[in-house]
């Protein structure tokens, strides 16, 4: 799955 919950963005 793709989403803010699984992906860390800086």
UniProtKB/Swiss-Prot annotation:
Keywords: Aspartyl protease, Hydrolase, Protease, Secreted. It is found in: Secreted, Extracellular space. Disulfide bonds: none annotated. One of its GO terms (molecular function) is aspartic-type endopeptidase activity. Transmembrane segments: none annotated. Belongs to the peptidase A1 family. This is Pregnancy-associated glycoprotein 39C. It comes from the Eukaryota. Expressed in placenta, specifically the fetal cotyledonary tissue (FCT) (at protein level).
């Amino acid at each position: 799955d793709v989403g803010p919950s699984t992906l860390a963005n800086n």
